[in-house]
Amino acid sequence: MLTIYAVSDSIGETAEQVSKATARQFKERVDVKRVTYIRTFEAVDDFINSIKDPENSMLISTVVLVDIREFLVERCIERGIRIVNVLGPCISTASRVLKTTPTYEPGAVWNMDDRYYKKIEAMEFAMRYDDSKDYNGIKHADVILIGLSRTSKTPLCMYLANKGIKALNVPIMPEIPIPEELFEVDRTKLVGLTIDPIRLIEIRKHRMNKFNQLSSEIQYANGERVLEELEYADKIMRRLRCKIIDVTNRAIEDTALLIMEAIGYNGFRES
């Protein structure tokens, strides 16, 4: 089940209507919850911290207050929550056509510099190719993360996107061949993610318990299966001769820093 949070710094009607229109496109259950008058950093923190299932949640935001909007995006990235700003592209396009700067409440002027657009482009890229079987993005990525399920690939891609880095992730499973495209790209763009087997089992068991998947995915957290996956992933990473980073008990920010160092990132990514 997906929960869409319609977030606004006003009454939230627009965000809710867009959220409901989105939900109606799917047969699966999608809940829509309106979150209104998000106008302070404290309100953002309280709201984001209240989300119990980040992986199965997304935000559709119409927040226009710049500081609050930026902070909301940062907090979403920290928790691996996907966010879509509805008004941003509309206002930006109108502004370019009118050749003028849009105004909001005092001090709330939309940041339309080159870095902002690169960040948005990178975030859209990360969401488009997240755990995807569409590998067309590999040749356009600044970094390609490869690793087993539950090695933080998605939140890392979103965090890197906030730095303007186009990050794509490729899941590794013994039953599924890795794409040949990985052998054709500059290997300095490849980063393998590994993890301690005991920690990986804990993470997977926690996920299974949360979604009551003990019967259908019993092998997912089985010790022998996890060791088999890790051994297979290690062989793949060595074949690719890529940088390998251990994410065990490491914060997203710390792992992202190591990734940025590995690819030679020393500032906002330029095209």
Curated annotation (Swiss-Prot):
GO terms for molecular function: ADP binding; ATP binding; phosphotransferase activity, phosphate group as acceptor; protein serine/threonine kinase activity. The keyword Nucleotide-binding applies. Pfam families: Kinase-PPPase. ADP binds at residues 147-154. InterPro entries: Kinase-pyrophosphorylase (IPR005177), PPDK_reg (IPR026565). Keywords: Kinase, Nucleotide-binding, Serine/threonine-protein kinase, Transferase. It catalyses: N(tele)-phospho-L-histidyl/L-threonyl-[pyruvate, phosphate dikinase] + ADP = N(tele)-phospho-L-histidyl/O-phospho-L-threonyl-[pyruvate, phosphate dikinase] + AMP + H(+); N(tele)-phospho-L-histidyl/O-phospho-L-threonyl-[pyruvate, phosphate dikinase] + phosphate + H(+) = N(tele)-phospho-L-histidyl/L-threonyl-[pyruvate, phosphate dikinase] + diphosphate. Its EC number is 2.7.11.32, 2.7.4.27. Belongs to the pyruvate, phosphate/water dikinase regulatory protein family. PDRP subfamily. Bifunctional serine/threonine kinase and phosphorylase involved in the regulation of the pyruvate, phosphate dikinase (PPDK) by catalyzing its phosphorylation/dephosphorylation. This is Putative pyruvate, phosphate dikinase regulatory protein.
